[in-house]
Amino acid sequence: MTRKLITAALPYVNNVPHLGNLIQGLSADVFARFCRMRGYHTCFVCGTDEYGTASETRAAEQGLSPAQLCAHYHALHRDIYQWFDLSFDYFGRTTSDAHTELTQALFRHLDARGFISEHESAQAYCLHCARFLADRYLRGTCPHCRNAEARADQCEHCGVLLEPETLLNARCVSCGTAPEFRPTRHLYLNLPALEKAYRSWFCTTNHLWTKNAVRMTEGWLRTGLQERAITRDLRWGVPVPKAGFEQKVFYVWFDAPVGYISITKCGTEAASSQEGGGTDDGVKEKWQSWWLDQQDVELVQFVGKDNIPFHTLFFPCMLIGSGQRWTMLTRLSATEYLNYEGGKFSKSLGVGVFGSDAKESGIPSDLWRFYLLYHRPEKSDAHFTWHEFQERVNSELIGNLCNLVNRTLTFVARTYGGVVPAQDGARSTRAQVMEETLALREAVRNTAKRMTDLMEQVQLREAFREVFALSARANKALQDGAPWKTRAQDRERADALMRELCYVIRDVLILAHPFLPWYTQQAARFLGVQLSSCAPEGGGAVCAAKKDADTAQPDTVQPTLRWSDVGERKGLTQVHPPVILFRPLETETIAAYRARYAGTARDGAGVSVPRTAQMPTGMNKKETDAQQKKEEREMPPPSDTARLSAFFSERVVLKVARVLQVERHPNADMLFVETLDDGSGVERVIVSGLVPYMAADALRGAHVLIVDNLQPRSLRGVRSCGMLLAAEYVDAQGTKAIELVQAPWALPGERATLASAPPVITPHGSAVIDADAFFSVPIRVVNYAVEVAGEPLMVGGRPLVMQRVKEGTVG
């Protein structure tokens, strides 16, 4: 298809985006620039997701109205994305009138066709504020880690998912009053009624999605779709246009995806206004030309893995259920997580480098783009570290690509007076000169073909690395040819090499332009050409009168190059003396940046958190010190192998259990509820997050290893007694997978012990340990063998051995 409708996941406006949040926008920008350079009619939209409880609560904390807060953060997001050179055709908001109209219209279509139902449920209610409390309006003490500021849906200190009724000392965040639970009625999207039609559509399109998206969506479908609430008792949101529900708003998951449509509509209206005309019908026709009754539009969406089901399942079901012929998802690129210095980014805790930090760091935006795209987490989680940032920038970007440009063009400027040599090696009568020239051209041709295929498949990281492989090949040709030595004796060979390298540089800059728009445009000027990744002439899309740095006009009219110009060998005549565009990152500077933007300490679970967040609100220093001493008594020093072994043998009970039954969690789509025979005579229930990784049938009958004496906890309303042990690996397709630790030869109840200990059957009811104590003893996979403190784990005299995981950590 030659029409590309490209979206990046709508960022939520409750804080500044961090580097991990920027991955989707950067990825979509690279693909949009590539599409424009290929001549595709392209529309690239994004915007801020502004409704919901997070905006309401954050606004209340800052003494602002939700509208004021959203306006502030919308402008902040817009400025950050502009600094990162994201070439949106339009960047909008979900608080527009168009968004409300389209969301309500979509709801009315669903309701009229019988896909909306009503149900009653219990919800926390504040008597003082006289309102129901959504998750973020209710806080209390986490029953697991005793963090006194846990939200009703999740504790950010220990990461455990919670239910409102499990909070200890629950209170309204606005007034501090303890809530009561009252019945309330809500509207639901009847997904079961849409499942047949959805499955039919899913089977025809998912081959163009990333593996993680397919796997996660299949996990939702295995046990059948469930009805999902679409309304909330809030004020800040799209009002529900239905009698009896006028005081409610739509759940943000329902209205946010409609933002892609409403932002496109706002963009076309803005473009029409700037063009000085256009009737209402013309405006409608423009946005409809992208979203309604179009067979030639390919919808390509970029999201993080936490947003997968909203784009692959819920939004498509909404569109299918409306009965209208909407443009449906064609290709989905879902990335894994980008972590920070061994920990996690956190908007609310302020952990990691944020967009505003990058902007203020003095480091050019293309250096950030380079690293984030070079390490794009396509198939597994990636990690940002300052050390590797420095290494990659200095060695690959500056030492490889920039070095090729500067060395080659400086030599031509000085030695040839800035005139590109006329000697075409492909026409030489000398075999050596011809072969060297044709070898470089073949390298360019092969790289361009591989990159084009990879870019069309949205495998951006591998495509980007092809640029540096070609650059390294050209650097080697320059070094081997050594024209500064050979030119006096072999002028023809030196001239042919330098001419060809000038064209190779032009090719490299074209191929790298979607990734590094500022650098490649500036470097292209040294060759007297310019690059373009803006909308094609007359394309329109939803282009406002936008003028990026990469599209700025030079002093004189110059040839504009596109993707199809790679491999062409005409048009270069002059070389301007190059200037240094990037300086290497110095070790001292990087150390200062790391200290400046870290400001973190390690909590007991190994999660990086700000020092100011280490002491949960409500615990004084004496209580915190006492808790720390208790943890120190329970957790052995990790460097003490003997004590690790002793602690494991005395405190940690791992034993075999047979999986009897597997069901989907009634309140959590990504969780299984397993019933197991653990040899005690009483069935055990464990909740696990294995839905995205394996089918229920793969679990049934398995003899798995469980943590027998782990402190029970409630996960979304189901009490979980223990934990299944598993390890991560990357499968043959390069995607993350999970392998369970199993002992098929063993009986239920048989305990796993260190090789030096005798096998035993553990009595039911051993002393419980918490998660921190369990994870303080690393269980590792070393050459397929499961070990603790360097000693093999055994069951029934046989070692535990993984089938797929060669090296890794068990948890």
Curated annotation (Swiss-Prot):
Q: What class of enzyme is it?
A: ligase
Q: Name one Pfam family in it.
A: Anticodon_3
Q: Recite the UniProt cofactor note for this protein.
A: Binds 1 zinc ion per subunit.
Q: Where does ATP bind?
A: 347
Q: Which cofactor does it need?
A: Zn(2+)
A single Gene Ontology MF term assigned here is:
metal ion binding
The protein's superkingdom reads Bacteria
Q: Where is the composition biased (Basic and acidic residues)?
A: 620-635
Record region (Disordered): 606-640
Q: Which NCBIfam families match?
A: metG, PRK00133.1
How is this protein named in the record? Methionine--tRNA ligase
Query: Could you tell me which species this protein originates from?
Result: Treponema pallidum (strain Nichols)
What's the source species' lineage? Bacteria, Pseudomonadati, Spirochaetota, Spirochaetia, Spirochaetales
Q: What gene is this protein a product of?
A: metG
